[in-house]
Amino acid sequence: MSLPAVAVCIPARNEAATIGNIVTEVAELVEQGVVADLVVVDDNSSDATGAIAREAGARVVRSGAGPGKGQALQQAVAATDADVLVFLDADVVNFSAGYVTALTATLLADPARKLVKASYRRPLNGQPEEGGRVTELVARPLLAQLFPELATISQPLAGECALTRDLAERVDFDDGYGIEIGLLIDTHLAYGRNAIAEVELVGERIHRNRPLRELTVHAREVLAAVLARAGTAMPELAELRSGP
C-alpha cells in the first residue's frame, strides 16, 4: 500500500531573505521521495521572493488574487492534487526540514486525524519563552473561554501545520491573521477535537518579530475569527478601546 502523497505549500510575500533556505531544505525531501510537490505562492511580492524560490527548487505560482494568506493558500491547494498538505510560514530564520517530517508523521499516525499543529518555543529579545504575544494574550484566553476543548493547544496561531485534503477542501480560509485559529476551530466543529493533534518541533522557532504597536491588527483579526465562529458579534473598535 502506497503512502499518501505530501505537498508542501508556502505562501510568501516579500520574504526574499528567508524563502531560499526554506525551499532548499524542503527540496531535499522532494529528492528523497518524502515530499511529492513543493509549491510556493508568490503573494504579489515586490522583491525577488518568487525568483529565489524557483531557483531553490520550488514550483512557483503567482497569486492572481489580491494580497492575503488565505487566498494564497487556497491557490496552493488548487495547484496540487496531493493527499496531505503541509503549510509553512516563509519568514522562519532557522527552518529545518524536520518540521515537515514531524508534522506529516504525526498526521499519518492516526487515520482519524485531520489537522496537526506545530508547537515550539518562541523567543523574544533573548528570552526563550516570551514570544507569541498575541497567542498568550488573545488567542489562548479566547479559546479557553469560548472553545474550552481547544484550550490545550499551545500554539493555536502556528502557521506550520499538516492537514488532509478533504479538510482543506471543506473549510474556507480566512484572508487575514485569523486564518490559523479559524482553521483550528473549523476543524474542531467539523470533525471533533480528536481530529486535531499537536507535535512539538525541536528547538526554538525564530522569525521576524513585530513591534508591539503593530500587533493591534493581528489581535483584532484573531478576535474577530474566534467570535464569528462562536456566534458572537464583533464589537466596534471604539467599544474595545473604552472597555468596562
Where do the protein language model's features map onto the residues?
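Structured catalytic core of nucleotide-sugar glycosyltransferases
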Residues: 1-147, 162-174, 181-244
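Active-site phosphate-binding and catalytic loops of NTP-dependent enzymes
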Residues: 150
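Activation loop
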Residues: 155-156
